[in-house]
Amino acid sequence: MQSLIWASAIPLYITHSSSTIPYLINVPRVSYLALLFPRLTSFFGENVSSFSYEGILLKNLPVGLLCDLYQPELPWRIELGDGPLFDIHDTFINSVKEADFMRNGNAKGIMSMSKEHSTQLWNSVQDNDFSTYHKISTILLNPATALKHIPLRIYLPSSSTPSSTPHPGSSGSSKAPSTASPPSPLFTFKTIQTLIQPQTTSREPQTLGGALNSVLPTLFPSKRDAILAEVILHGATVPFKAVLEDLMREASYADGWLNVCVVMLN
């Protein structure tokens, strides 16, 4: 499944105020918009440093995750601007370190990796080279010690009811500016991150439904069925019975994080 995810792409329709001609491109779901800056600067003849959608400055997240969050019509029409410039390399490596720390209780895996392997990891993302990426990620995902926690981030629309607030101490927030667009896209969201063990207290494999129920019990009252909300990952609805560790190994983004987006049911 991981190779199929890396092969999937999002069609983009990129515009700049200086030109009436758009830049059309298919971008891998696991890639980052910032990697397009050199070719876009050359195409439009203008220095560019940010992307926006419906007036909202897009964060430095994987393209597929941004698409899952905002749920735009395709091709996705985004605008170029001169907002704050992200250091995409440092951002990516720091995120890899965070995921490594979450899995093992330390970041020794990535910190002890050779410079050659570290460079190959980053280059594989830039080049969408799954073969090289898989070789390096296999090292990170199979340390000598047992897996401690799953690097899981839950993106929750802020319009969710107050009663769906996660367990105290388990959440952070990340909000985009409000907009007059229809409320269905997740224009404003919270990012929830907490410690999820790969097994339950009864030593059973932890499922996605079990994790959601433990973090957001009111929003996900059942461990087996989506009653009030469901989650999407890489553009697809994920069954609650899916084993979390299997998802981590097959469907994490290139930085090692399993990013799921909550979608409220009618």
Curated annotation (Swiss-Prot):
Pfam family, one: ATG5_UblA
This protein's record includes keyword Ubl conjugation: yes
Cellular compartment(s): Preautophagosomal structure membrane
One biological process term in Gene Ontology: cellular response to nitrogen starvation
Keywords linked to the UniProt accession: Autophagy, Isopeptide bond, Membrane, Protein transport, Transport, Ubl conjugation
Topology of this chain in the membrane: Peripheral membrane protein
UniProt PTM: Conjugated to atg12; which is essential for autophagy.
Gene Ontology CC, one term: phagophore
Biased composition (Low complexity): 158-179
Cross-link type Glycyl lysine isopeptide (Lys-Gly) (interchain with G-Cter in atg12), residue numbers: K97
Region feature (Disordered): 158-182
Main location: membrane
The protein's assembly and partners: Conjugated with atg12.
Functional note: Involved in cytoplasm to vacuole transport (Cvt) and autophagic vesicle formation. Autophagy is essential for maintenance of amino acid levels and protein synthesis under nitrogen starvation. Required for selective autophagic degradation of the nucleus (nucleophagy). Also required for mitophagy, which eliminates defective or superfluous mitochondria in order to fulfill cellular energy requirements and prevent excess ROS production.
Family the UniProt entry places it in: Belongs to the ATG5 family.
UniProt protein name: Autophagy protein 5
Organism name: Sclerotinia sclerotiorum (strain ATCC 18683 / 1980 / Ss-1)
